[in-house]
């Protein structure tokens, strides 16, 4: 039996219950013939959702004797913006709200929403997509809501992995093995990830202006959970605390000799088609926001998620929001406030165990005070790189610096430690705060009305801010690197250079060629990365085999790739 998807609508009480069911072409029975029970959708004190009478409830249920082990699922809006990060390997009956802040999504009735499914083909085998989902939907009572399956737009070379075995039938159950995160990543990133997708479109002509969307997934297979609201579980510890767990092995290494997972345009997860564009950006104004957003959004997980998945370098760009002047992260379009990014860092780096213990009764006990200090922050080294700050005035630079110092009080390492700083020297102040204010010199006007030839140094008296040009090398040419082949060719030369005792970034970044209009309008940065990134993984595997040093590996959509596994392996084995 194949997978089955069910969408249900809970209407007003004066309407008949409607059920829209997608059935398999090979079976005559639906997943569930019963109407959604009140137990499923009623308010519950323990629920993180509030479900009102007029809310739209959308359920996706899986029932099948599938041989398939792994799924990747994401929710998109009609502009193909990822609303939230990928959900990997759901446990049976787990529920999740697609929102970075763990709150309800307020549905825009003017938009369609899509769910994309990626399948892993373990056998390098495929079946016709018509066997994967039935495209005939039964709509009771002629309700105005409808589901449309956009299967005609699927690429002709689409291949999906087998979802069934003809030797088994509906009632034959399988025992699926429990797998570790390492094994999951190994399976997914052995270049078997199929980059094509099935798109299920659902649309609701709501009588209210605001609806809540809730997604529920279930499956006979109890899957290991890689993404969830709760990041404190056992299986996240190897990523969330990977430096702490391997402290004895890495503490005497210089930070610039570590392999560190990095995030490009790290906080662009908030960009969507309705986001404002940054004034003066180079993107032509005639290109609609629905297209610009697809290429401006480089991450789908928030900073806390990225930290939890082991990422330790963050590329952060700041500009003032129009009218309000509030400091925001940007990449052609405005994303989220800087304060949100800093709050996520604080949330992650603070050691909650410290705050659960009583204070020492003897303030003169230096040993006890040292133990408490050791417990204050996690021993996870983080590099923040504030750059592309050309939109900020002197006053806004000062505002940003004050916010960073205030939010990250006590966590910032002094730049006097230098670029040869060792991991153990950052045990109590784990954040290296790299700041680039070079753009200021272009706008400083002297008394004679001429631009200053001397750079304005806004961090001269700020020892907790490391100079970008003295601390970091991050070379890239956005005018040339339009294919993975171009980037890898450049990186192959870059790894052989002497980076003059600085941290250095290997930018595994693809830049779209503005001349390829068809590619721009029909694709997105996310889909492009999924198709090209296995080549980057192969490149770094070759570096590992030859023991070629590398430092920061920076990627788009970083939580989708196994760079943390790679970093841990190299840091503890070399």
From Swiss-Prot:
Residues 21-34 have a biased composition (Low complexity). InterPro entries: PI-PLC_domain, PLC-like_Pdiesterase_TIM-brl. GO terms for molecular function: phosphoric diester hydrolase activity. It comes from the Eukaryota. GO terms for biological process: lipid metabolic process. Residues 270-449 form the PI-PLC X-box domain. Residues 1-42 are annotated as: Disordered. This is PI-PLC X domain-containing protein DDB_G0269228. It comes from Dictyostelium discoideum.
């Amino acid at each position: 039996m194949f997978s089955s998807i069910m969408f249900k609508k809970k209407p007003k009480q004066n309407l008949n219950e409607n059920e829209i069911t997608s059935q398999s072409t090979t079976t005559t029975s639906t997943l569930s013939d019963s109407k959604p029970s009140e137990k499923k959708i009623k308010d519950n004190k323990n629920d993180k959702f509030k479900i009102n009478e007029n809310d739209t409830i959308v359920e996706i249920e899986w029932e099948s004797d599938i041989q398939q082990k792994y799924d990747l699922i994401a929710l998109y809006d009609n502009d193909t913006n990822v609303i939230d990060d990928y959900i990997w390997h759901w446990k049976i009956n787990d529920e999740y709200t697609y929102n970075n802040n763990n709150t309800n999504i307020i549905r825009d009735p003017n938009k369609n929403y899509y769910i994309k499914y990626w399948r892993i083909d373990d056998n390098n085998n495929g079946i016709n997509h018509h066997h994967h989902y039935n495209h005939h939907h039964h709509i009771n009572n002629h309700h105005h809501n409808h589901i449309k399956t956009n299967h005609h737009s699927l690429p002709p070379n689409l291949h999906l992995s087998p979802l069934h075995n003809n030797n088994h039938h509906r009632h034959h159950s399988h025992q699926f093995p429990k797998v570790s995160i390492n094994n999951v990543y190994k399976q997914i990133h052995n270049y078997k990830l199929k980059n094509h997708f099935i798109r299920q479109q659902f649309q609701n002509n709501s009588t209210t202006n605001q609806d809540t969307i809730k997604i529920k997934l279930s499956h006979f297979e109890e899957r290991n959970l890689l993404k969830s609201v709760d990041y404190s579980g056992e299986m996240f510890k190897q990523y969330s605390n990977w430096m702490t767990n391997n402290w004895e092995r890495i503490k005497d290494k210089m930070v610039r000799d570590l392999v560190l997972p990095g995030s490009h345009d790290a906080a662009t997860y908030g960009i969507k088609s309705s986001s404002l564009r940054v004034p003066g950006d180079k993107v032509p104004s005639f290109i609609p926001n629905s297209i610009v957003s697809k290429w401006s959004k480089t991450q789908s997980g928030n900073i806390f998620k990225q930290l939890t998945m082991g990422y330790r370098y963050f590329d952060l760009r700041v500009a003032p929001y129009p009218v309000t002047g509030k400091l925001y992260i940007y990449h052609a379009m405005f994303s989220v406030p800087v304060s949100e990014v800093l709050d996520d860092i604080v949330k992650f780096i603070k050691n909650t165990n410290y705050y659960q213990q009583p204070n020492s009764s003897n303030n003169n006990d230096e040993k006890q005070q040292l133990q408490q200090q050791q417990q204050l922050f996690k021993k996870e080294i983080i590099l923040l790189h504030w750059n592309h700050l050309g939109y900020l005035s002197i006053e806004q630079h000062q505002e940003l610096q004050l916010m960073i110092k205030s939010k990250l009080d006590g966590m910032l390492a002094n730049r006097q430690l230098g670029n040869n700083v060792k991991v153990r020297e950052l045990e109590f102040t784990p954040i290296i705060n790299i700041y680039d204010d070079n753009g200021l010199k272009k706008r400083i006007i002297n008394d004679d009305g001429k631009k200053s030839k001397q750079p304005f140094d806004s961090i001269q008296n700020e020892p907790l801010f490391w100079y970008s040009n003295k601390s970091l090398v991050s070379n890239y040419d956005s005018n040339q690197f339009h294919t993975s082949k171009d980037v890898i060719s450049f990186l192959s030369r870059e790894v052989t250079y002497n980076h003059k005792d600085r941290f250095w970034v290997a930018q595994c970044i693809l830049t779209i060629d503005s001349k390829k209009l068809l590619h721009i309008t029909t694709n997105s940065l996310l889909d492009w990365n999924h198709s090209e990134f296995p080549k980057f993984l192969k490149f770094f595997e070759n570096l590992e085999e030859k023991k070629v040093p590398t430092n920061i590996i920076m990627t788009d959509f970083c939580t989708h790739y196994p760079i943390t596994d790679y970093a841990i392996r190299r840091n503890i084995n070399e």
